[in-house]
């Protein structure tokens, strides 16, 4: 890479989410002036470990644990105000972090209401065996209201009369829908106004036009870091539809979600695990079964931060990563949880798919085709040495080095960082010119 000192760094989950974006955001936040989350909602969780203390977050950007940086919730994020209330700030206050000073929220974010969560739950029950595995946080129905132009944005609460009118209009229809599904308890305008007004007063001073904040940061040559939730394979358009999220967590959506021109994005990092996981429903060609599956799940603590659900476990999928590389235009990538693979005697890597007797090297666009794909695997020797205290690539066991080099060869993108444990200090940066 050139000697450019990158000012704008975007990180994109390149699998099915849960790749470790929270940890990496916290890591780079130590150098950033601004951290911006541009999409998703509180359906995605992030776990950060600092000096062996574990913190689980959902809506506040992971950079909140850096007192020097400003954290921004961008305009395409959907927000449950209760998750931003004072009661959820205890974790930060206990460690000396004041969100009133280092958090700002776009006045354009759409709000999640109780009726969104109820409808989300009902839709999942109605689908039965065809459930898509939603977290039932109301994310999809909120984005649906946005697309139908009946959504309520955070900035609407500054106009009490206008807010109440929009809420009343929505409740007329939402209550009718809920009653038809035998949920007879009405969601009333008065009750919702009281709840939302209470939460709004707590965060009112944080609400602003964040696109101006970001624009000023760019022109003042500040370093800022862009982060999404979920991953490329959960993208509404490019993922395994319909088993996807309701937003676009690929780098191409950054300009819309943040409010900047594409030319300001200097570098895009793809983040992946040294193996593969997914949660919910949908095709997963490289899935592992048996003892190795159980070992990786327990060693990697592979349970959803928000849902608590056990994640599916799979071998590293090179075809999926090439798909992500092309969609996101990944310049460098980061390998997380390499330590989890320690003591596994044979490691496998998916290098192709078998589909109807033919070998293919791409991700099919339809679920039916993708579900019929079988992995074509190569085998590499594992390692037994503890790598949790390694601080350089050269300090890794020979087989671990060979494994990383093979992944780099398959994907065709240089690895710039790898992780050997959950703590911030267990992050090894191989290319110091990233940021």
From Swiss-Prot:
Cofactor(s) named in the record: Mg(2+)
Pathway membership, UniProt: Purine metabolism; AMP biosynthesis via de novo pathway; AMP from IMP: step 1/2
GO MF annotation terms: adenylosuccinate synthase activity; GTP binding; magnesium ion binding
Catalytic activity annotation: IMP + L-aspartate + GTP = N(6)-(1,2-dicarboxyethyl)-AMP + GDP + phosphate + 2 H(+)
Keywords of the record: Cytoplasm, GTP-binding, Ligase, Magnesium, Metal-binding, Nucleotide-binding, Purine biosynthesis
Superkingdom classification of source: Bacteria
Signal sequence range: none
HAMAP family (alphabetical): Adenylosucc_synth (MF_00011)
Quaternary organization: Homodimer.
Entry protein name: Adenylosuccinate synthetase
Gene from which this protein is expressed: purA
